[in-house]
A protein has these predicted regions:
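Juxta-kinase regulatory segment immediately upstream of eukaryotic protein kinase catalytic domains
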Residues: 1-20
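An alpha-helical support segment within catalytic cores of ATP-dependent transferases
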Residues: 4-10, 124-136, 141-142, 146-186, ...
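ATP-binding glycine-rich phosphate-binding loop
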Residues: 17-32
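Active-site acidic catalytic loop and adjacent metal/ATP-binding pocket
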Residues: 30-35, 119, 173-219, 231
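ATP-binding pocket architecture of kinase catalytic cores
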Residues: 32-144, 156
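Protein kinase-like catalytic core scaffold
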Residues: 41-42, 68, 82, 185, ...
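Secondary-structure capping and boundary motifs in well-ordered enzyme cores
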Residues: 142, 188, 210-213, 261-266
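Active-site activation/catalytic loop segments of kinase-like enzymes and analogous catalytic loops
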Residues: 145-157, 217-252, 266-275
């Protein structure tokens, strides 16, 4: 914490009014809130430089396109600490958990899908996928990796007997289906309500995209609407899917999106079970 605080105070040119850590959530990244009399900031400390570089790369592109993502104000020389925009006190996940599915949360979910559509379409042709963190695209390698998490769950946790060759053939078939899903573009990968901030004006912001890669555009839509913790009712999911499809004006694109929904839904369920 001390290094992050010193870096922040060097940036603001004075002692911080307040400086405290945020709870970690399944990541090695450490986040802090630093305050001046007029403004709050997020200070992030992370030893994983390739992960940081991916975040910096995407943030620069997103800021240039005026998307709903944090601006980065300063990066340390060793690329391990950075100061970013403070975008709200609560995640969308916290709001859903507290309020349930009311008119406010429905509006926030709809806004999230609209902002996702904006990100997907405005970044088309503007991403160098060689700069991604772990995988350039959601192809055979990450798909197979996800499926083998599920295999370990079946074999090691539930101890359900299965025919190995048959299961592997099914994996191969599903991998091929996922690889052929269209349209493709920027896929955030971990597009969950816990990674979406909501400010005092009920505007949503995406904050966790360092693992983004090229992939089927329906992946993030399905990840978001079918996340277990939100527990959206099926009729609301269908309503929001229709809302998302209506944003696309090309009928062939909508047809492709609809055709890719079921295979992606299946692999997302398998990922959740495997994790």
């Amino acid at each position: 914490m001390e290094n992050a605080k010193l870096f922040f105070e060097e940036f603001i040119g004075e002692k911080s009014l307040d400086f405290y850590s945020l709870a970690q959530s399944g990541s090695a990244r450490k986040n802090f809130v630093g305050s001046t009399p007029n403004q709050q900031y997020i200070i992030t400390e992370n030893e994983n430089i390739p992960e940081n570089e991916s975040f910096f790369y995407f943030s620069e592109i997103f800021s240039g396109l005026n998307l709903n993502t944090p601006k980065i104000f300063k990066i340390s020389e060793d690329r391990k600490i950075y100061i970013q925009e403070f975008l709200g006190k609560h995640t969308l996940s916290e709001i859903i958990e507290k309020e349930g599915l009311n008119e406010r949360t429905k509006s926030l979910v709809r806004q999230t899908l609209e902002k996702l559509f904006q990100l997907q379409t405005s970044t088309e042709g503007k991403i160098d996928y060689s700069k991604t963190f772990e995988y350039e695209s959601y192809d055979e390698f990450p798909v197979t990796n996800d499926l083998f998490y599920f295999k370990s769950f079946i074999a090691d946790v539930l101890e359900i007997p299965y025919h190995k060759a048959t299961l592997l053939k099914e994996f191969k078939h599903l991998t091929s289906e996922i690889e052929n899903c269209a349209p493709k573009g920027l896929m955030i990968r971990d597009f969950q309500a816990r990674n979406i901030m909501v400010n005092d004006n009920d505007e949503v912001f995406f904050i966790d995209y360092q693992s983004a890669m090229k992939g089927p555009l329906m992946y993030d839509v399905i990840s978001f609407l079918y996340q277990a913790k939100a527990n959206f009712p099926e009729d609301f999911r269908e309503e929001m899917l229709s809302c998302y499809f209506s944003l696309w004006k090309d009928e062939n694109t909508v047809k492709e999106l609809k055709n890719s929904a079921k295979p992606i839904q299946l692999i997302r369920f398998m990922q959740v079970l495997g994790a």
